[in-house]
Amino acid sequence: MASGQQERSQLDRKAREGETVVPGGTGGKSLEAQENLAEGRSRGGQTRREQMGEEGYSQMGRKGGLSTNDESGGDRAAREGIDIDESKFKTKS
């Protein structure tokens, strides 16, 4: 059984070979870099949710989830008659 230190060494080696070993760590060149990237991305999303409020963040996610390579989320929502309240996208004052 591999110890925690050995496991981290193996993950670091894989990361240095270009493999993503930490969810959200895409682009990091080492295990530590990937961990830092993942933490920053998570914190950024939480900050955005706090700025916009839960409802606005949810509406923005709905719109983004509708987008495709051929069509923006707003265009698709309009075409399919899906109601997205963009007034909730504003940050709280």
UniProtKB/Swiss-Prot annotation:
Residues 9-19, 38-52, 73-93 have a biased composition (Basic and acidic residues). Induction: By abscisic acid (ABA) and osmotic stress. Keywords: Stress response. PROSITE patterns: SMALL_HYDR_PLANT_SEED. The keyword rRNA processing does not apply. It comes from the Eukaryota. The keyword rRNA-binding does not apply. One of its GO terms (biological process) is response to abscisic acid. Belongs to the small hydrophilic plant seed protein family. It is thought to provide protection for the cytoplasm during the desiccation stage of embryo development. Wheat contains at least 10 different genes for Em protein. This is Em protein.
